[in-house]
Curated annotation (Swiss-Prot):
Protein name in the entry: UDP-N-acetylmuramate--L-alanine ligase
E.C. designation(s): 6.3.2.8
Gene3D superfamilies given in the database record: Mur ligase, C-terminal domain, Mur-like, catalytic domain, NAD(P)-binding Rossmann-like Domain
The organism of origin for this protein: Shigella flexneri serotype 5b (strain 8401)
Record GO biological process: cell division; cell wall organization; peptidoglycan biosynthetic process; regulation of cell shape
Known catalytic reactions: UDP-N-acetyl-alpha-D-muramate + L-alanine + ATP = UDP-N-acetyl-alpha-D-muramoyl-L-alanine + ADP + phosphate + H(+)
GO function terms (MF aspect): ATP binding; UDP-N-acetylmuramate-L-alanine ligase activity
Annotated localization: Cytoplasm
Record carries keyword Ligase: yes
């Protein structure tokens, strides 16, 4: 954005001219880094802190941001405002220093709300599918020449970034319910993909509280705004009478305003028809597998149709959709070293899904697209509380694969909970008599323990939200081959 455009943007809110230096605590998170990237491109001085470098921090360094890989009081010196991730505790030395210096401290969603304030905001919320749906909406609007700004919780692979500053009037953003901070947003259009019990510590363990929070989020829409909601979801169907705004429903259900019909999956692509009110049927080829992605596409099409975007632009965007990072992310197909006289190839897929519903959707997509493959899953449970709260659901879902290897629970800062650990979960699954899970106590042993279970006609799903994505990439780098001690030392 040039100086004239920046001046025009800042002149909308004259007080924003006082803001020069914005500091982010926890800047390496995808959501935080995305907002920082948009603000850097708007011309603000950006600094931030995190514990370790990652691709997000590298992208920001490339844009001229100052990044500290520590948390120290002096990092916030001269900041006009400090933006804090929900993962950061109140006693963080930078937060304490900001309060002492009377520097405003705001949450990530509050800054996102400021970005959205004078744009046509489209917010995508829901327990599952937010990131992919955000990328689909962004891709359609970009294909239509509308040059949107987008802020996503995952890498938009076609753009190579989590966020991008556009010159159009639209801002398309993932809305995060995990800490209820999406209540700061005031979009013109809101998508809600589904509502399930997750992040229940935020909602005092009360599902009714979670449902009411989604209603409050939708009530942030102006009376002339629109809620786009998946009517297949029983909770959404229950809540529809309470929305109090114009609504468009979508789903496989016969009463959906935008209805998915005749779904068929061939390899990584979905093929289906969308039936829309007062519109010609749309025959879609979607470059993303699974019925869940057909629903995500239906939500994106509902929004784009309401905006008047041409069907041809919609179809081009969906057929060429490149997906998002760590969402059924195909990392390669590798020849296998002969093991027990077997040889062949194995496909490697990395997926972020860490809730039983998400894991189930990924397994179903793999089975539908590659029905003859031996399905091997390397799974890392995420958080002890989630493992405890959804223990039986995890045990049921994980029995659907042919072979299961399980890493220890990724704690995400939580203390261990007795009975909510990977060893207990493996024992429960084994007791159901369908598969015999393998506990992997050390991530360094993954390739070694994986090799003997491969048949030469395999699809390996690396599944979870912790540091397992790094393990997936390392498996791709070594092409699934166990390393000798000499090779590991050389690496």
């Amino acid at each position: 954005m040039n100086t004239q455009q920046l001046a025009k943007l800042r002149s909308i809110v004259p007080e924003m001219r006082r803001v020069r230096h914005i500091h982010f605590v926890g800047i390496g998170g995808a959501g935080m880094g995305g907002i920082a990237e948009v603000l850097a491109n708007e011309g603000y001085q950006i600094s931030g802190s995190d514990l370790a470098p990652n691709p997000v921090t590298q992208q920001l360094l490339n844009l001229g941001a100052t990044i500290y890989f520590n948390h120290r009081p002096e990092n916030v010196r001269d900041a006009s405002v400090v933006v804090v991730s929900s993962a950061i505790s109140a006693d963080n030395p930078e937060i304490v220093a900001a309060h002492e210096a009377r520097i405003p401290v705001i949450r990530r969603a509050e800054m996102l709300a400021e970005l959205m304030r004078f744009r046509h905001g489209i917010a995508i919320a829901g327990t599952h599918g937010k990131t992919t749906t955000t990328a689909m909406v962004s891709s359609i609007y970009a294909e239509a020449g509308l040059d949107p700004t987008f802020v996503n919780g995952g890498l938009v692979k076609a753009a190579g970034v989590h966020a991008r500053l556009g010159h159009g009037r639209y801002l398309i953003a993932e809305a995060d319910e995990s800490d209820a901070s999406f209540l700061h947003l005031q979009p013109m259009v809101a998508i809600v993909t589904n509502i399930e019990a997750d992040h229940m510590d935020t909602y005092q363990g009360d599902f009714e509280n979670l449902k009411q929070t989604f209603i409050n989020f939708l009530h942030n829409l102006p009376f002339y705004g629109r809620a786009v909601m998946c009517v297949d979801d029983p909770v959404i169907r229950e809540l529809l009478p309470r929305v109090g705004r114009q609504t468009t429903t979508y789903g496989f259900s016969e009463d959906a305003d935008v209805r998915v019909e005749d779904y068929q999956q061939i390899g990584p692509q979905g093929h289906f028809t969308l039936l829309r009110q007062d519109k010609e049927p749309m025959r879609v080829t979607l470059n993303a597998p699974g019925r869940h992605n057909a629903l995500n596409a239906a939500a994106a099409v509902a929004v784009a149709t309401e905006e008047g975007i041409d069907d041809e632009a919609i179809l081009r965007a969906l057929e060429s959709f490149q997906g998002t990072g760590r969402r059924f992310d195909f990392l390669g197909e590798f020849p296998l070293e002969p093991v027990n006289g077997k040889s062949g190839t194995a496909m490697l897929v990395d997926d972020y899904g860490h809730h039983p519903t998400e894991v189930d959707a990924t397994i179903k997509a793999a089975r539908a697209g590659w029905p003859d493959k031996n399905l091997v899953m390397l799974f890392q449970p995420h958080r002890f509380t989630r493992t405890r709260d959804l223990y039986d659901d995890f045990a049921n879902v994980l029995t659907q694969v042919d072979t299961l290897l399980m890493l220890e629970v990724y704690p995400a800062g939580e203390a261990p909970i007795p009975g909510a650990d990977s060893r207990s979960l493996c024992r429960t699954i084994r007791g159901r008599g369908k598969i015999d899970p393998i506990l992997v106590p050390d991530p360094a042993q993954v390739a070694e323990m994986l090799a003997p279970v491969l048949t030469g006609n395999d699809l390996i799903l690396v599944q979870g939200a912790g540091n397992i994505g790094k393990i997936a990439r390392s498996l791709a780098e070594i092409k699934l081959k166990p390393q000798t001690p000499e090779e590991e030392q050389h690496d």
